[in-house]
Regions:
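Extracytosolic secretory-pathway proteins
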Residues: 1-181
């Protein structure tokens, strides 16, 4: 079994860069309602450890993540990896070996910078109070090749340093992820 998995899973230490593209992303901004945005950018993960439960897998650390969108209302909206070490490691779990099938669960902490916030002033920086969870439970290959990940629940966004003052919510984030070696 381990020999079969050996070819399926990336080795510890490997860094995997991917492009990200998410269209028609609904961002609820309290005073404006829902703004629809198209994000593009990238994410990079590093394989940190093996998972021994079930059929096995690996734990992944997000080491770079940034996507941005242009909005006529909000200007440039940028989602960037937050500079914190408390984000859980992401998971790549083997669901079956013949044929290969995987579930990837991505845990993300980030800031959202809105260039032209409603009400004026300089850029507004928001952060998520709890990690965003993106899942694809139907991967047939890893790294992903044009695979779509879905946000598991809406993400509340509040000003950095004021996590209870929610002013926006990321409602969905259907993101297509493609390995970009």
């Amino acid at each position: 079994m381990a020999a079969v998995l050996g070819g399926l899973l990336p080795p510890i230490g490997l860094e995997i860069p991917c492009s990200c593209y998410a269209v028609n992303v609904p961002l609820q901004v309290n005073v404006l309602g829902v703004i629809t945005l198209d994000f593009k950018g990238g994410i990079k993960v590093r394989v940190e450890a093996n998972i021994s439960d079930g059929l096995g897998g690996v734990k992944l650390k997000v080491i770079g993540h940034e996507v941005s969108a242009d909005s006529p209302v909000l200007g440039k909206v940028t989602i960037s990896q937050a500079d914190i070490d408390t984000t859980p490691l992401s998971l790549l779990e083997v669901l079956s070996t013949l044929p290969p099938s995987f579930r990837q669960t991505m845990f993300l902490d980030f800031t959202v910078t809105i260039e032209k916030p409603p009400g004026g002033g300089g850029p507004l920086v928001l952060s998520n109070a709890t990690p965003a969870v993106l899942v694809n439970d139907n991967l047939t290959v890893f790294p992903p090749q044009g695979s779509v990940y879905q946000l598991q629940q809406p993400v509340d966004l509040a000003p950095v340093g004021a996590p209870t003052q929610v002013v926006a919510q990321l409602l969905q984030f259907p993101v297509t992820v493609t390995h970009n070696p």
